[in-house]
Amino acid sequence: MFLFGKQKTPKEVLRENQRNLNKSMREIDRERVALQNQEKKIILDIKKMAKQGQMNSAKIMAKDLVRTRYHIQKFYEMKTQLQAVSLRIQTLQSTQAMAEAMKGVTKAMITMNRQMNLPQFTKIMMEFEQQSDKMDMKEEMMNDTMDQVMEQDGEEEQSQEILNQVLDEIGIDLASQLVDAPTTVGTSVASKHQVNSG
């Protein structure tokens, strides 16, 4: 297929498929609108036949109406399926863009590593790790201290009672944040306990 021409990139293939899908969806919409207009006309014809007493003709038209509505529904389903495929293509395009961005970052990192003074970089990283370890130790000690204070000062029932008060005051929004920010909630509970104790 590409013996005498340039092979298309994955990005170009995705874009072409996206264009074809959009074109197909527009054609489906046109057909569906035409069928809906036909549906309205059939309904008017059925009413007209019924008023004239032509019940056999009205029944035939009613069957046409059923078929027309069936096709309209099918066009809706087809468009929904194409939209799902379109969304998948957009996701693939995003993934492709992400991969290209990662390639760029990797190249930049390689260049940076070549240009950087390795001993100096190693020293900086070691200092960073040491300071990070110190911070982790301090945070762990603070958490242990807070846990001990809470165990000595407040029991399970009191903690639950305080938490319920906080939830009642702030509302449902805090409940949704419990999973995302447990540390914040713990601080709020501890603050509330101190206020109540004082």
Swiss-Prot record:
InterPro entries: Snf7_fam (IPR005024)
Keywords recorded for this protein, A-Z: Coiled coil, Endosome, Membrane, Protein transport, Transport
Gene of this entry: chmp2a2
Protein name: Charged multivesicular body protein 2a homolog 2
Protein role: Probable core component of the endosomal sorting required for transport complex III (ESCRT-III) which is involved in multivesicular bodies (MVBs) formation and sorting of endosomal cargo proteins into MVBs. MVBs contain intraluminal vesicles (ILVs) that are generated by invagination and scission from the limiting membrane of the endosome and are delivered to lysosomes enabling degradation of membrane proteins.
Subunit structure, as described in the record: Probable core component of the endosomal sorting required for transport complex III (ESCRT-III). ESCRT-III components are thought to multimerize to form a flat lattice on the perimeter membrane of the endosome.
Organism: Dictyostelium discoideum
Family per similarity comment: Belongs to the SNF7 family.
CC per GO annotation: ESCRT III complex; multivesicular body
One GO term of the biological process aspect: protein transport
Source domain of life: Eukaryota
Coiled-coil ranges per UniProt: 11-42
PANTHER family, per database record: CHARGED MULTIVESICULAR BODY PROTEIN
Compartment(s) where it occurs, according to its Swiss-Prot or TrEMBL record: Endosome membrane
Pfam families: Snf7 (PF03357)
Membrane-topology descriptor: Peripheral membrane protein
Disulfides per UniProt: none
Signal peptide region: none
